[in-house]
């Protein structure tokens, strides 16, 4: 039996199901291959809004949507084998679940059951996501985030994360007070709740106005930095991703630096968290970030190790960071030369990534004192 694919899963450019969804700074999601080709062709506007993009547009992985897409084949196979009336029944079923969730007389056990089933429904159906939002259930979900019951808190955060997949909900959730709850969870929640809360911040931060709101909210950034320092692998990865999303907004870079993040990010990068290198690649654009990086002992060695063993994105950012630091310090130039970076850069001449080739060329010119030709 045939079934309809959710439009949310299709790239607006290729119209194909996305295999690696990424979020453009305009807030819209595209398949990485398609939007990268758009950017590499010299386009500096959003394909949908036509609004201008920065010279080097940031592409933020949409982990939540990717997870939904990966699960979709399994779910859709089960759904397609059901009678159409049963699929339609899920919509009427969702209304009963919403009623239970918002009812003041419902027990925690009843609310947990409703949340669990709504999370499952909203994962794959944008119309149900809109229905939940329009019904006023967001307030009830936010109240559950305040609960001392960790399971109830985790399910309510998961529901809010699913709702945030709708672009129209991103600003609305912030207006409803979700940031305060997220910050509290980042401070005192369970490990799973902290990871989901950080992922929710990433989803909300794809909207420019939310970047500013989140960044200026007391303790929001410091809570992420703290999670990066003491969290488990999942928590650290999600906190670094959230910081990356927030730091695409220039005013947030100083805030992140002022929270003492640079040594923590360097340590994370040294332990293999390459998302931390990407955050440093944004922080190096502000003066305070460069000053803090120059103070961290062994930082150049960490970046050189990424050049030798990292993925393409990590190499790209490491080259960029080294060039920024070398432009400001002769001592760092000498250290970078001693680490054999000139030779490493020559090895990138035939790299598949145009950005890596360009960054390597620029760094070599900086290290050798050769002006770049216009």
From Swiss-Prot:
UniProt repeat feature ARM, residue ranges: 126-165, 167-206, 208-248, 250-288, 289-327
UniProt tissue specificity: Expressed in the whole plant.
MF (Gene Ontology): ubiquitin-protein transferase activity
Signal peptide: none
Keyword Transferase in annotation: yes
Keyword RNA-binding: no
Keywords annotated in UniProt: Repeat, Transferase, Ubl conjugation pathway
InterPro entries the record matches: ARM-like, ARM-type_fold, Armadillo, RING-Ubox_PUB, Ubox_domain, Znf_RING/FYVE/PHD
Pathway: Protein modification; protein ubiquitination
Biological process annotations from GO: protein ubiquitination
Result after altering residue 179 to V: In strain: cv. C24
Protein known as: U-box domain-containing protein 8
Source organism per UniProt: Arabidopsis thaliana
């Amino acid at each position: 039996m045939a079934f309809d694919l959710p439009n949310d899963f299709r790239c607006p450019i290729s119209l194909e199901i996305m295999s690696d969804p990424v979020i453009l700074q305009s807030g819209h999601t595209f398949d990485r291959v398609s939007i990268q080709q758009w950017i590499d062709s010299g386009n500096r506007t959003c394909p949908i809004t036509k609004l201008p993009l920065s010279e080097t547009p940031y592409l933020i992985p949409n982990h939540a949507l990717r997870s939904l897409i990966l699960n979709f084949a399994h779910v859709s196979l089960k759904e397609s084998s059901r009678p159409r009336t049963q699929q339609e029944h899920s919509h009427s079923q969702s209304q009963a679940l919403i009623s239970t969730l918002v009812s003041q007389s419902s027990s925690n056990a009843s609310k947990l059951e409703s949340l669990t089933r709504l999370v499952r429904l909203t994962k794959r159906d944008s119309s149900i996501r809109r229905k939940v939002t329009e019904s006023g259930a967001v307030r009830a979900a936010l109240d559950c985030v305040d609960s001392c019951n960790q399971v109830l808190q985790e399910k309510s955060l998961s529901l809010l994360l699913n709702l945030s997949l709708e672009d129209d909900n991103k600003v609305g959730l912030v207006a409803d007070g979700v940031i305060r709850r997220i910050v509290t969870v980042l401070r005192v929640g369970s490990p799973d709740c902290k990871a989901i809360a950080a992922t929710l911040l990433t989803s909300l931060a794809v909207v420019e106005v939310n970047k500013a709101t989140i960044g200026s909210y007391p303790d929001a950034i410091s809570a992420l930095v703290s999670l990066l320092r003491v969290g488990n692998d999942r928590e650290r990865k999600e906190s670094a991703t959230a910081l990356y999303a927030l730091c695409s907004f220039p005013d947030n870079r100083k805030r992140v630096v002022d929270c003492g993040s640079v040594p923590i990010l360097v340590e994370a990068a040294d332990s293999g968290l390459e998302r931390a290198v990407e955050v440093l690649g944004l922080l190096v654009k502000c003066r305070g970030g460069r000053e803090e990086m120059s103070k961290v002992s062994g930082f150049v060695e960490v970046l050189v190790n990424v050049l030798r063993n990292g993925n393409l994105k990590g190499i790209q950012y490491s080259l960029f960071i080294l060039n920024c630091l070398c432009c400001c310090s002769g001592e760092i130039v000498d250290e970078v030369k001693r680490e054999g970076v000139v030779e490493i850069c020559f090895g990138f001449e035939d790299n598949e990534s145009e950005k890596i080739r360009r960054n390597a060329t620029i760094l070599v010119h900086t290290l050798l004192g050769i002006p770049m030709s216009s």
